Amino acid sequence: MLQILAATSNQHKVAEFRSAFAPIEDKIQIITMNDIPPFSMPEETGSTFEENAMQKARSASAFADMPAFADDSGLEVEALDGAPGIFSARYAGENATDADRIAKLLRELEGKPNRRARFVCSIALAYRGAEVKTFRGEVAGEIMLQPAGSHGFGYDPVFRPDGYDRSFGELGAEIKDRISHRARALEQLVAFIKQELDSMDDFEFE
């Protein structure tokens, strides 16, 4: 069975990763950061989601000596010129909570009629410290006037995806795991790995 490291300590993301890999769980074992010796992820110095994801995936795969994937994701708001973007997790400061970040976002959007936004996720797959492939997923929607729902994390309570009348925070994991930006990027990652597994007796990325 192939072991792949999910290079994140965010348990919400780990749950989404495990759900995405369920169709091939008989062939893939997801290893988490809790399963390996302590490892400090590199500082995110990239200018894009893709660059940050690849930095983390390369470092994790080299450290653990196994294939690893990492994601970088965030919210891009049209009226804020794409902010918070790659700074989504640090939008209200290093020690801010999800509620702090949401509050700042809503303040920044006060009086702005355009509330269009999109979630973006880039997932990078690396092996032995080298890039293998990146995958990108997006979901468009609008920022609501106030938070709603207790599911999910991050900006989920104020993001209403197109085609729905409720926020990600209200829709719950079953729907979010099917339509979210991360779900769409994960779908591509899983399909790529499945294709590689099906085409090779002894799976290698090289």
Regions found by a protein language model. Give the residues of each.
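Anionic-ligand binding patches
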Residues: L2-L5, Q11-E206
